[in-house]
């Protein structure tokens, strides 16, 4: 997976994510929408109870891993199913393309989430930190991306 973005004054203005395994190119430009292989994409309108939750967790921080699984279990009780893929950029694109309804990870570097976060927003989704606060792209952050504000 390859992910790239362009920031202007702390705001992502262009985001691109390429999945070579499925030959999918996701991209978005602020104010212009989100696309996959040239087709416009949108988040799903499924409620969480009928939806899929995606999450990530770092294998390098066992305390963070424990908190991630506790949160995953809490979301699993509300959702239809849950998955962990290992790629923040692709998980964010899955939200944008309507393949899942919610994604979270407790600590990511900006290069892991910046491009995908714009793609989600331009597809109609919402991206914040885990506490619902705006993302600061200059530093590591938690991520909560969803198909709509809950």
How would you label these PLM feature ranges?
Residues 1-3:
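Conserved small/polar residues in nucleotide/adenosyl-binding loops
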Residues 5-92, 133-135, 139-150:
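Acidic beta-strand-loop-alpha-helix segment within the catalytic core
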Residues 93-96, 114-122:
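Hydrophobic residues within well-ordered alpha-helices
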Residues 97-102, 125-126:
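Alpha-to-beta junction loops
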Residues 105, 130:
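Short beta-strand and adjacent tight-turn residues that come in two discontinuous sequence segments
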Residues 111:
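Acidic donor-binding loop at a coil-to-helix junction in glycosyltransferase catalytic cores
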Residues 122-125, 132:
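Short glycine/proline-rich, acidic loop/turn segments that cap or connect secondary-structure elements
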């Amino acid at each position: 997976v390859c992910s790239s973005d362009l920031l202007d004054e702390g705001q992502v203005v262009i985001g691109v994510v390429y999945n070579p395994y499925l030959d999918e190119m996701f991209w978005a430009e602020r104010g212009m929408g989100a696309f996959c292989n040239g087709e416009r994409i949108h988040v799903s309108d499924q409620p969480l109870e009928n939806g899929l939750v995606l999450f990530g967790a770092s294998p390098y921080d066992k305390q963070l891993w424990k908190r991630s699984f506790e949160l995953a279990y809490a979301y699993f009780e509300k959702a239809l199913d849950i998955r962990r893929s290992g790629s923040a950029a692709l998980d964010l694109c899955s939200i944008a393309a309507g393949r899942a309804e919610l994604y979270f990870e407790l600590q990511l570097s900006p290069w892991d989430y910046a491009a995908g976060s714009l793609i989600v927003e331009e597809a109609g989704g919402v991206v914040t930190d885990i506490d619902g606060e705006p993302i600061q792209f200059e530093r590591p952050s938690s991520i909560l991306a969803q198909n709509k504000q809950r």
